[in-house]
Amino acid sequence: MYMSRMKKKQKNIIKDVASERIERLFKLAAEEYSSNPGRSDRYVHLARRIGMKYRIRFPSPLKRKMCRGCSSYLVPGSSSRVRLHGRYMTITCLKCGREMRIPYHLKE
């Protein structure tokens, strides 16, 4: 029983470190995008691989900044197109053409 508790604690520590690294890589991608878009794509690719390895869910704001098709960093107007259709926001990657549809609700 004692060993399983230690393993769970160690697993949580590893996931926390991985989450911090993912957030750091996205910050670096945002800073680097204007001067070197290829490097920012690489940072997002690394963050995505870390997330898959340690089975971490990405927060919604970070999900909207990466393309699931080509692992590139998405900047509205530069590397992605954002359109509003009815009750959905459509984000289109301009590299691979993949679309993300995100529902939104208008306040009444």
Curated annotation (Swiss-Prot):
One Gene Ontology cellular component annotation held by this UniProt entry: ribonuclease P complex
Subcellular locations according to the entry: Cytoplasm
One Pfam assignment: Rpr2
Binding site for Zn(2+): 67, 70, 93, 96
Record-level Gene Ontology MF annotations: ribonuclease P activity; zinc ion binding
Manner of cofactor binding, per the entry note: Binds 1 zinc ion per subunit.
E.C. no: 3.1.26.5
Signal sequence, start to end: none
Biological processes annotated in GO: tRNA 5'-leader removal
InterPro entries reported in the protein's UniProt record: RNP4 (IPR016432), Rpr2/Snm1/Rpp21 (IPR007175)
Keyword Amino-acid biosynthesis part of the UniProt annotation: no
Catalyses which reaction(s): Endonucleolytic cleavage of RNA, removing 5'-extranucleotides from tRNA precursor
EC category: hydrolase
Keyword field: Cytoplasm, Endonuclease, Hydrolase, Metal-binding, Nuclease, tRNA processing, Zinc
Cofactor: Zn(2+)
Function: Part of ribonuclease P, a protein complex that generates mature tRNA molecules by cleaving their 5'-ends.
Subunit structure: Consists of a catalytic RNA component and at least 4-5 protein subunits.
Family: Belongs to the eukaryotic/archaeal RNase P protein component 4 family.
Protein name listed in UniProt: Ribonuclease P protein component 4
Lineage of source species: Archaea, Methanobacteriati, Methanobacteriota, Stenosarchaea group, Methanomicrobia
Encoding gene, per UniProt annotation: rnp4
